[in-house]
Curated annotation (Swiss-Prot):
Belongs to the KptA/TPT1 family. Its EC number is 2.7.1.-. Keywords: NAD, Transferase. Transmembrane segments: none annotated. Pfam families: PTS_2-RNA. GO terms for biological process: tRNA splicing, via endonucleolytic cleavage and ligation. The lineage of its organism: Archaea, Thermoproteota, Thermoprotei, Desulfurococcales, Pyrodictiaceae. It is an enzyme of class 2 (transferase). One of its GO terms (molecular function) is tRNA 2'-phosphotransferase activity. Removes the 2'-phosphate from RNA via an intermediate in which the phosphate is ADP-ribosylated by NAD followed by a presumed transesterification to release the RNA and generate ADP-ribose 1''-2''-cyclic phosphate (APPR>P). May function as an ADP-ribosylase. This is Probable RNA 2'-phosphotransferase.
Length: 233
């Protein structure tokens, strides 16, 4: 990830070393940013108790409480003594996938999606007019038979995750193995089946499940090249 700077003029967090015409103040290296982002994701989605955090029913926790938990309670806290409120806010604001939501007026933060701990995010179901034309979900060929038979299920998460960004779906699939398959999903089909679709960030959408007949296409990725192979739906 890119390093993060703070503008000496407007105080904005930025990935650019020059902002408002002046050299910006270094805040985090790219390595520090990546490590902190992964830790924040782990604590806010899956393991808040391991840093002594108590999420509210909607998944929010105080920013200062998160910083204290990381520095005082997390098992590898000796690696994170540099973390301050500014670092947490900067990671959240600059996250390229919108993984975090900030409520600075109340001094709190939460994960926008991806939870395995039970939370009620309170997102509004999208209307037909608000739905994108198609969504993608990354998986691997080994999972295709069960998916095409039973559909997509949340598994350990609370919701099925889909994206409007094809490359992000490929990246997700690669986490599960080399034989990546990107599923094409019709969100209007979900709505017609009474399955709500929620928007969690600019590119991430959620649904409780995806039945097989709402999967309209499959795109296989050759692990040795960038070539796409369109499979029969």
């Amino acid at each position: 990830m890119k390093p993060v700077y703070r503008c000496r003029v407007c105080s904005a967090y930025t990935e650019e070393p020059v902002h408002c015409g002046r050299p910006a103040e270094p805040l985090m290296t790219g390595e520090q940013r990546l490590r902190l982002s992964k830790l924040m994701t782990t604590l806010l989605r899956h393991l808040p108790h391991e840093a002594g955090l108590r999420l509210d029913p909607q998944g929010w926790v105080g920013i200062d409480e998160l910083v204290r938990g990381i520095r005082e309670r997390w098992r590898n806290r000796h690696l994170y003594q540099w973390v301050t409120r500014d670092h947490v806010i900067a990671v959240a604001l600059l996250d390229p996938k919108g993984r975090f939501q900030l409520d600075l007026a109340r001094g709190r933060i939460r994960a926008a999606y991806g939870h395995t701990v039970r939370v009620e995010l309170g997102y509004r179901p999208l209307s037909m007019d608000e739905l994108p034309d198609k969504l993608y979900h990354g998986t691997v060929a080994e999972n295709l038979a069960s998916i095409l038979s039973e559909g997509l299920k949340p598994m350990r998460r609370l919701m099925v995750h889909m994206t409007t960004d094809y490359s992000s779906a490929v990246e997700t699939g690669r986490r599960h193995g080399p034989n990546v398959v990107v599923l094409v999903i019709d969100p209007r089909c979900l709505a017609k089946h009474g399955i709500p679709v929620y928007r969690a960030s600019d590119t991430i959408y959620l649904a409780p499940s995806v039945p097989p007949n709402c999967i309209t296409g499959k795109i296989a990725r050759n692990p040795q090249s960038a070539r796409k192979t369109y499979l029969h739906a």
